[in-house]
Amino acid sequence: ELKHQLLRKYGGYLGGLRQEFSKRKKKGKLPKEARQKLLHWWELHYKWPYPSETEKMALAETTGLDPKQINNWFINQRKRHWKPA
């Protein structure tokens, strides 16, 4: 009985949450071509791998990724693979 009362009261809200969660993208690897383009930039700028905002926008456009994905890729790449001189 309590379950039914709660479902009646909050059912719409829960359905909305369920739908919202199902819309979210699943985590996964970036497309291979995008990774290759980012790695190419990385290799050319290894000594100082901090792209400017303009470079990030250009990379986002050429890779088809969001600027936030570009930003996160560089943060992770520097953390995992960059040893400043």
From Swiss-Prot:
Listed Gene3D superfamilies: Homeodomain-like
This protein's UniProt keywords: DNA-binding, Homeobox, Nucleus
GO molecular function: DNA binding; DNA-binding transcription factor activity, RNA polymerase II-specific
Subcellular locations according to the entry: Nucleus
Domain of life: Eukaryota
Stretches assigned to the ELK domain: 1-21
A single cellular component GO annotation: nucleus
Keyword Amino-acid biosynthesis: no
Tissue and organ distribution: Strongly expressed in ear inflorescence primordia and shoot meristem. Weakly expressed in embryos. Absent from leaves.
DNA-binding feature ranges: 22-85
Alphabetized InterPro entries for the sequence: ELK_dom, HD, Homeobox_CS, Homeodomain-like_sf, KN_HD, TALE_homeobox
Main function: Probably binds to the DNA sequence 5'-TGAC-3'.
Family membership: Belongs to the TALE/KNOX homeobox family.
Protein name: Homeobox protein knotted-1-like 8
UniProt organism field: Zea mays (Maize)
Gene from which the chain derives: KNOX8
